[in-house]
Amino acid sequence: MMHYDVAVIGGGIAGYSAALRALQAGKKVVLINQGQSALHFSSGSIDVLGRLPDGSVVNQPFDALSALQQQAPEHPYSKVGRKNSEKGLMWFKRTLDSAHVPLHHEPDGANHWRITPLGTLKNTWLSQPFVYPYRGNADFSRIMIVAIDGYRDFQPAMLRDNLAQRPELANTPMLTVNVSIPGFEGFRRNPNELRSIDIARLLRQESAWNALCDQLMRVARPDDLVIMPAIMGNGDGLHLMSKLQQVTQLRFHEVPTMPPSLLGIRIEEALHRSFIQGGGVQLKGDKVIGGNFAGSRLTAIHTQNLRDFPISAEHYVMATGSYFSQGLQASQHAIQEPIFALDVQQNPDRAQWRHAQFIAAQSHPFMTFGVTTDANLHPSRQGKTIDNLWCCGAMLSGYDPVFEGCGGGVAIATAYHAVEQILATYAQTKQPEVLL
């Protein structure tokens, strides 16, 4: 049997955050994840809180947590608290900074808007260096939207038309510029089938890189905001974006594209690299299929690839995600947590799972379904609390990450809070030094 201090189940942003925090504290950590996480589909920004459950828009996310506590006392933020939520987010920022993916937030602690691929504005709190933090006051003379010939995963006309609906941008010129990148013929496939990661590889060629720089400098000025799809990546995206800015002297705003999202991949690669370099053990491509329980404790877990070799730990953190990641499974009449059969908060009347209208002014109820936890994020199983198991991230009940714009923030805050409680148990059991 393999034994660890902390075993983390799930390799998304919550799972990696929990594993890294425990590893930084000197614990022996194993991380088990089945495959690619939802970070491959993410914007690469961290949303803390964009709206309250009643639909009120949030400007200062941490200040709004007191109002959130009143509206949703079972919300994960309400259980973690403002102080620990802030500490968790700032810890994450420092961790990514040290992994060479610096994230920025507004000096006054407010949300900023990021321009999405659809040309809408979305509240967020932490963004990557080449995501323009728009707050309603344009400090650019024009918006230049880059269209790459043959690349279908970015629709510049849609972005331009939607962005032009903003009243404060009504008098700001918006131009679409077409850019051709040589070398597509070397891929031996239809250039219209290329993805962002294909273009990222292509731009490693000097001729393709120089062609991109030359075309951008011919059409854009330093006082423009140049919006382009995130096509710099595959391990060195931020370095290449910095190089592009230095060569062209232009100001860029990257927008994520259809998956794979290179902005999200940057974060996952940074977290993975930090975990492995820190000495963590990762079972990638494996899946936890069950566990052994003794009273109120989880004593061991079993994986699909290591059926005859159970993994035991003093503490377990579960971050298997929601429906998308199969951390929750929905049948015709019920929602289940499929690994340990943990108790799930849900409405037994399926007719009450959603509103009559798909596009509704309030959150659909099924989005708030998830694993039931106590104030310390311990789940229960058949009504009995599991004392050495913590749940975090999208599998939790009591919130809607999409409607409220808080998915990344909740994942980080709950993971950090869970591990801080684990570390506190070690501090309590530490034997006092004997002075001779």
Curated annotation (Swiss-Prot):
It comes from Vibrio cholerae serotype O1 (strain ATCC 39315 / El Tor Inaba N16961). It is an enzyme of class 1 (oxidoreductase). One of its GO terms (biological process) is glycerol catabolic process. One of its GO terms (molecular function) is glycerol-3-phosphate dehydrogenase (quinone) activity. The keyword NADP does not apply. This is Anaerobic glycerol-3-phosphate dehydrogenase subunit B. It comes from the Bacteria. Pathway: Polyol metabolism; glycerol degradation via glycerol kinase pathway; glycerone phosphate from sn-glycerol 3-phosphate (anaerobic route): step 1/1. It catalyses: a quinone + sn-glycerol 3-phosphate = dihydroxyacetone phosphate + a quinol.
